[in-house]
């Protein structure tokens, strides 16, 4: 399945919640009606079956992290092999993706922009350039912006927006140096309560 390149707000309306696909400069609810789906008959939201709810939750999380279907299923399989709660394991694996860590540190305004920064070799991990968005970041790894990329206006703008948001407790960022430490893998309580990962586990367990 190809990566979605259409309107970002359309996806948020489809899922009925902010997927954080836009920069966050202004509130998303001022730009679109999240309570109604996109399209001519968007106001009429169908009543979803149990399977429909599970599918929607999977699509929502997949879109939040910008992961394709095959990648997402592989993350689930890995999460199921690990000890502990499969749903929590899944979210933690997604949180350790390099593009997501770059976003959490505020170097990219969105995960899509962060993914582009990684792909364009603007990001280093422990002093080495890494251009694989799915690269798994480990606890205590240091993520930084390459010196020649630090003048990019979009990175500076992203850091300004990030300064207005509540900072994640599991990363430590020096905005002046454009460098951050991934202190630990986040706990479930650190992450969005609007995600119901158990629905995804039920979907893939069938």
Swiss-Prot record:
Family classification: Belongs to the universal ribosomal protein uS4 family.
GN (gene name): rpsD
HAMAP family, per the entry: Ribosomal_uS4_B (MF_01306_B)
Protein name: Small ribosomal subunit protein uS4
PROSITE patterns the record matches: RIBOSOMAL_S4 (PS00632), S4 (PS50889)
GO BP terms: ribosomal small subunit biogenesis; translation
Taxonomic path: Bacteria, Pseudomonadati, Pseudomonadota, Gammaproteobacteria, Alteromonadales
Subunit structure: Part of the 30S ribosomal subunit. Contacts protein S5. The interaction surface between S4 and S5 is involved in control of translational fidelity.
Domain of life: Bacteria
Ranges for domain S4 RNA-binding: 96-156
Entry-linked InterPro entries: Ribosomal_uS4, Ribosomal_uS4_bac-type, Ribosomal_uS4_CS, Ribosomal_uS4_N, S4_RNA-bd, S4_RNA-bd_sf
